[in-house]
């Protein structure tokens, strides 16, 4: 890429990429992976051994997200121990997409798993041992949305977030505020 070549010629060797507005699709994550870069979205969560290096989470630490208690919780969080799903976040027909999570340990107790998204608390259904389906209470709004899931572990939390993007009904992209 021209930008990468220009940085290399200037003596920089980039190793990380931040997705603008945290937006990505699977084709873009594959490009980031093929370039040997770590990719960072804007989905919340901790990085763990099963994290996708082309789509790593990062926490917001500004505005309403910067309080001391929230900061401490985020620093102490753990990655949700799941096999990370390869999901294209662009929603087109199904405006209430289900998120399937497969836990690394099928014996994990998912009864304390809590997920939030558009419309508040989400419905969690056990599909099989160690596999849950999460569905929103309402359709995703136009723009960016996230499903955020936490599972307590002592005084800490396992955390995972999934981005979704929905275009306008005419197929055009939403405008930034």
Question: Which ranges hold each PLM region?
Answer:
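Catalytic domains of cell-wall/extracellular-matrix polysaccharide-remodeling enzymes
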Residues: 1-63
């Amino acid at each position: 890429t021209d930008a990468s070549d220009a940085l290399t010629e200037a003596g920089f060797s980039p190793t990380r990429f931040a997705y603008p507005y945290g937006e990505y699709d699977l084709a873009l994550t594959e490009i980031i992976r093929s370039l040997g870069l770590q990719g960072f979205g804007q989905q919340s969560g901790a990085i763990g051994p099963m994290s996708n290096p082309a789509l790593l989470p990062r926490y917001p630490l500004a505005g309403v997200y910067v309080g001391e208690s929230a900061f401490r919780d985020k620093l102490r969080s753990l990655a949700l121990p799941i096999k990370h799903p390869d999901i294209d976040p662009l929603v087109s027909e199904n405006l209430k997409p289900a998120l399937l999570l497969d836990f690394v340990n099928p014996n994990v107790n998912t009864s304390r798993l809590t997920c939030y998204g558009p419309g508040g608390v989400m419905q969690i259904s056990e599909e099989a041992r160690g596999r849950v389906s999460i569905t929103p209470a309402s359709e995703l709004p136009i723009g960016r949305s996230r499903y955020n899931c936490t599972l307590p572990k002592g005084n800490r939390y396992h955390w995972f977030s999934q981005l979704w993007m929905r275009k306008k009904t005419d197929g055009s992209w939403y405008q930034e505020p």
